[in-house]
Amino acid sequence: MARFVAFLRAINVGGHVVKMDVLKAAFAELGFTNIETFIASGNVIFDARSKERVNLERRIERALEGTLGYEVTTFIRTPSEVAAIARYEPFPRAAMAQAASLNVGLLKGQMDPGLWPAVAAFRTEIDDFHLNGSELYWICRSRQMESKFSNAAFERKLKLSATFRGLKTMEKLAAKFPPTA
C-alpha cells in the first residue's frame, strides 16, 4: 500500500459545503484505506494499492463528481513530496518572515517554463511568485484581499489547473503525516 495526500480544489467554497464524513465515505467506496481528513478544506490522506497518480486522481474526480454533483479537481502528492514542499524556501527568509501570507499552488504536473512570463505578469509590489517543479509559491506582502492575484485568474490566463494552500497548512500536514521510511 502507498500513502497519498489528495488536495481537492474548491471543495468548500462557492456555496458548496461538504462534510468530511462524506469525503471519507467516497474515498472508502474507491477501496482506499486509512482515510483521514485534515481541516475542512479538502485535504484527504489515504492508502491505496495503486501507485498510478494520474489514475488515482481521475478515479477520485469521477467519484466525487458522482457523489457531490460537481467537478472537484484533485491533486495528489506523497507524504515525502508534502514534506519537501513544506521545507522548501522559495524566497529569502527575511521576506518569508515578514509576509502577510505565503501560499503554495499545487499544479497538475510540471508547468512549461515557457509559461513563466504569464506568471511573472501577476507580480506586483505585494505579490511575488516562485516555481519549483509542480508547485508555484506565492508570497503576499499585504492582505490577500488587496492582491489582484487569484487561483481563478491564474487558471484562466495559463489554462492550468491549480489549488492553493497556505504554507503553514503544508507544514502541519507534513508534521502530522510524515513520510515513512
Task: Cite the ranges covered by each PLM segment.
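Surface-exposed, charge/polar-rich loops and edge strands
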Residues: A2-A181
